[in-house]
Amino acid sequence: LNYEKYIDDHFPFEKFNPGQKEAIDFAVTNLVAGKKHILMELPTGIGKSAIATTVHRVMRQIKKGKENWKTAIITATKGLQEQYLHDDKEIFSLKGRQNYPCSKNAGHYGSAKCKQTCNAGGCVPASSCDYFKTREVWRLHADLRLTNTSFQIKAPTVLIGDDKSRASLTVIDECHEIDEQLVKHAALTIDVVDLTSIEKVAGKNFTGRFAAFINDFSEYDEGFYFVPDADIQKSAKELIDAIDTKAGELEQKAKESSHGHGSIAAVIDDLRGWATALHSFAFSGGEWIIEEYAYAQKLVLTPVYTHQVVNKGLYDKCDQFIHMSATICGFDEYMKTMGIDKKDVAVIDAANPIPVEQRPVYAMNAIKVSG
């Protein structure tokens, strides 16, 4: 099929930059064909934001009457997020929670003071919290939505990947940075100090399960590399099941009573996050490192490879993906890092309209060192 008319109708500017229209057509054609991943190495200045938004609108028109097409665009920097908002006024943006001042002067959503305020009945996020309300519109109603990479990775699948909230397409801008972000945010950190707000709502016996899980690693040293064995998987599964049960009980409690609803909602969010992180750790099939351990107090586990955590971080939450960057620097290596099967991918390397002699590359004479 020829999608040229759709592209012309939805492109936001009078003229296309060199290679821009071809990139849009390539993405749309392969999305319609069912490719799960579209890898696009696009030169700086081509206009990636217009490519992303035009692809969304063309796909929405193609799918009209068949499905409610939703696109999530994720960026690694606040500056790039602002650029998207400047270029397209119809995008609905969710920023980091620190960007939403609290009307109760209790810090950002999910902070210790916020949880204390909610626990005391001083706030109901659904009616009083700008971040919470914006997040709900973003995930449930916005069909062209924008957020930061951190939120997309850290948000549990039940929050942004269920039937009500799931995006049809996720556009990963500056995708050359996504592997580091995935490893960073996939780290499993259990700190008993952080469980105080959960304990007030869920009880001491419940939070004691976390300390017991920490102690399952007492025989290992910090810096130890390992693959979760059957015993660790069993321990993690028991904790996940306990978390799921408690979250279900709290959701029912929230429905039955308006008092304390805010604190319960915050705790449910935390519990969902724990369950997602634990599942990613125990059942990803990859190697992990014990970064930090303190008996019955703290445990930090970090994945060794990106591909072992990418499903929980990204792929389980959406159906199709566009990976865009000016510096992918090798499609095969990127696919290996990101756990992408060649049969599921289409790639395009758009030519740079700027002559090579005007694009010098400078090598920085620097290395990383530790003190």
Model-predicted segments: where are they?
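Conserved phosphoryl-transfer catalytic core
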Residues: H176, E180-K237, D241-D244
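Conserved helicase ATPase motor motifs in RecA-like P-loop NTPase domains
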Residues: E41-G45, L195-F213, C318-E333
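Conserved Walker B
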Residues: A142, T149-S150, E174-I178, L182
